[in-house]
Amino acid sequence: MTKIKIVVIVGPTAVGKTALGISLAKAFNGEIISGDSQQVYRQLDVGTAKATQEEQAAAVHHLIDIREVTESYSAYEFVQDAQKAISDIVSRGKLPIIVGGTGLYLQSLLEGYHLGGQVDQEAVKAYRQELDQLSDQEVYELLQVKSITIKQLNRRRAIRALELSQFADDLENAETAYEPLIIGLNDDRQVIYDRINQRVDRMLENGLLEEAKWLYEHYPTVQASRGIGYKELFPYFVGEMTLAEASDQLKQNTRRFAKRQLTWFRNRMAVGFTAITAPDYPQVVHDRVRDFLGQKEKS
């Protein structure tokens, strides 16, 4: 079977994945698929670092704004949606370029997990509602009953593990249909941390506070509100923190998230990284893609 070539750009938040994706899309006749679990939500633009309207005009983007904030979204659904997007892009003679930082989503796609049959979404929803009625202790006890172990014990991870166990028969692990070129972006820790701090400041200047307040006032408990960028500002709205304190908390949590992303990509996906401050960084990446596609450099 001839595998479909795809380019996958990974790295910590704020490292510049979107800009590189657009650059590659322009150079290699590509279209971008968002691999970010938060960018699927409509009306959440600033806090999710969604590609701007100008950026989306520069290159076609898929899997952005495909869910309402009241809806949940899972790795299963991402794999389905990404497979459809890849098929669509390839059918038009273009290169699929996946850009994102949600490691579980990307790993699920690249390692060949797909839905063996149509998962009954109503059954998934009903099971999740059952779990929502349980206390934390009852959820953890259910993990033990099912002999499920997870590394970091918290309610959200526990429920995900229980759902995976419950619907495991609906999944197949098959040889992946894709040949990926994985491009990892990174740099010295302080460079990344400075970029994160600067981006949080820009987000606050560009409407993050208003976006977070709207989410807090209308949908404070939905899955989308748990993403980094929103929940850190909720204490400010009720007077438990000053804006400066909430901003610092957001920066700290984002830095921690970036560290977890890097750990995932190194340990789960064996990604090698390119320093974004290297003088030849853009050219090196473009050359890698050109070699991967078997293209000659234009004179």
Swiss-Prot record:
The record marks T102 as: Interaction with substrate tRNA. It catalyses: adenosine(37) in tRNA + dimethylallyl diphosphate = N(6)-dimethylallyladenosine(37) in tRNA + diphosphate. Residues 36-39 are annotated as: Interaction with substrate tRNA. InterPro entries: Dimethylallyltransferase, IPT, P-loop_NTPase. Keywords: ATP-binding, Magnesium, Nucleotide-binding, Transferase, tRNA processing. Its EC number is 2.5.1.75. Its cofactor is Mg(2+). GO terms for biological process: tRNA modification. It comes from the Bacteria. ATP binds at G11, P12, T13, A14, V15, G16, K17, T18. Substrate binds at T13, A14, V15, G16, K17, T18. GO terms for molecular function: ATP binding; tRNA dimethylallyltransferase activity. Gene3D superfamilies: P-loop containing nucleotide triphosphate hydrolases. Monomer. PANTHER family: TRNA DIMETHYLALLYLTRANSFERASE. Catalyzes the transfer of a dimethylallyl group onto the adenine at position 37 in tRNAs that read codons beginning with uridine, leading to the formation of N6-(dimethylallyl)adenosine (i(6)A). Belongs to the IPP transferase family. This is tRNA dimethylallyltransferase. It comes from Streptococcus pyogenes serotype M4 (strain MGAS10750). The gene is miaA.
